[in-house]
Amino acid sequence: FKLASRRRLYNARVLQADNIGDKQRNPDVDAARQNTQIVVVGAGLPGLSAAQHLLYNGFRRTVILEATDRYGGRINTQRFGDTYCELGAKWVKIDGSQDSMYELLRNTEGLDKQIKQPDRATYLQDGSHINPAMVELIDTLFRQLCRGFKVSERVKTGGDLHSLDNVMNYFRTESDRIIGTSFQQPKDQLAAREIFQSLFKEFGSILGCCLEYVNIEHITKCPVQQELRPLYVPTGLDNVVDDLIQNMDKAQLQTGKPVGQIQWTPAPMKSVGCLDGSLYNADHIICTLPLGVLKSFAGVLFRPTLPLDKMLAIRNLGFGNPLKIYLSYKKPIGRWLKGSLRPLGTLLNPSAEQQPERNWTQQVVEISQVPSSQHVLEVHVGGGYYEEIEKLPDDELLEQITGLLRRCVSNNLVPYPQELLRSNWSTSACYLGGRPYFSTINSARDVQRLAAPLGEKSPGLLFAGDATSLNGFGTIDAARSSGIREAQRIIDFYLKRAHFG
C-alpha cells in the first residue's frame, strides 16, 4: 500500500502484478486471482477496504457496486463556510493495530493530520459558570461508568439487577448513588445531576439514540468512549477515502448502481442484480450494506431469504442516527463566543409554555467552534429527536438555536447564521441511520451471527461493516477491519484449497 501511495502514476494492474510478483507462485492460486469474480455491494469504508485488499492481492475481477453517486459511505466531508465539516465520522483513534483507520491515515502521504487539542467546555447553569473542579470530578466518575464500572460486581451479588435493564437505568442509578455520597448541599446536588444529564446526552449523541434502548452489554463488551486526543484531518477525512480508490478504475468502482437483488445460491455461480437492469455474476459477494438498509430490505433483497438466525440478528441489533449540525456566520464568532459551551437547566428549558416542536433544543449537549475555523459552529445534540430535527425547516431550526445561543452568552445581538449544514442519515434511503448499537433485545452473539459467511463449500455471501465486529463495534475502525477480514477470508479459501487440494 505504501508503494501505491508513493507511485501515483502507476496504474492499478501494474501495481497488482508487482505486489504478487515476488510471492511463491502456485498455478491454482494464480488461476483464482485471474478468474474469480467478486462483487462488493457498497462503496463505504468496508467495501472500499475489502476491494482494495483483494486487488492488492491480485484478485483483478473485483467490482464495487455503489447505489449513490459518491463513494465513502458515512465518511462525508463538505466544504462549508471557511472550513471543512464532517457529516459522518470525524475522529481517528490513535491505534497501531493492523488494519486500523490510524494505520491507513498514517500511510496516506502528504496529508495534514492534527491531534485534537484539549478544550474544556464551560458548563452554564442559570447564567453562571459551574465550578470546573466539580465538572472534572464528575467527568472522571462518568468515564468509569462508561467502562462498565461495578456492573460485573452487581451481577455477581445479584443486587438491584433492574438498574441493568438498559444503559440509562444503570447511569441514573449509579449517578444518584455518587451524588448522594459526594455532594451534601442541595445546590451542589442539583448542579451535579445536571452535569451528569449532559454527559448522558453526550453518550447518546455518539450512538444516536435514547439510552433506554441500549443494552448494558454494549458498555461491557464494546465500550463507548470518546478518545481524549484523537486525530483529525483539517481538510477532510474523505482524503483518506480518495487514497483508497486511487488505483481503482471505473470498471472496478461503479457508482449509481443501486442493488435490487442478491442471488447467493445455488452454487457455483451467484449474481447481483441492479435496479437499472444490469446483472453481475459472482463467485463471492461481499455485502457491506448499512444495518438500517438490511433492517428494511433484507427480506426482499436476498434470494433465497437469509437464514433465520441472521435475519434475527439484523432485527435485534439497534441502529441509531448521530446528528451533525453546523452553522456558518458572516463575521468571526470569536466576538461573542469565547469557548465551548454546555447549557444546563433553565437555559435549555426557560419556559414551561414552550411549543412541543421547540423541545429538541433541550437535547443540545455542546456548542463549539470548529477547529481551524473562525466562522463555523458545531452543535452537538443528544437524545432521540434526530429524525424530527432532520425534518425541521431551516428557518425554525435557526431561530431556535439562535435563541439558545443568546441565552447562553446573555447577548440578544448574537446574529443569525448565514448558512446551515446538517446530516440526514436517518432519512436517506441508502443509509436509514448512522451507527449500530446493542439494543435491549440483542447480545454479542448477534454481531457474530451477522458476520458469519454463508455458503456450503465456499464463502459465497460474506458480510462486512461496523455492525459485524465486536472489536471497535460501530466505529470506522470496525468498518475498515471488517472489510479486510472478509477479503482475506476469500484469499485464504483459495490458498487453503491450493495447498490441501
Swiss-Prot record:
Pfam families: Amino_oxidase. GO terms for cellular component: cytoplasm. Its main location: cytoplasm. It comes from the Eukaryota. Gene3D superfamilies: 3.90.660.10, FAD/NAD(P)-binding domain (3.50.50.60). Has a non-vital function. SUPFAM superfamilies: FAD-linked reductases, C-terminal domain, FAD/NAD(P)-binding domain. Disulfide bonds: none annotated. GO terms for molecular function: polyamine oxidase activity. This is Protein anon-37Cs. InterPro entries: Amino_oxidase, FAD/NAD-bd_sf, Flavin_monoamine_oxidase. It comes from Drosophila simulans (Fruit fly). Coiled coil: none annotated. The gene is anon-37Cs. Keywords: Cytoplasm. It is found in: Cytoplasm.
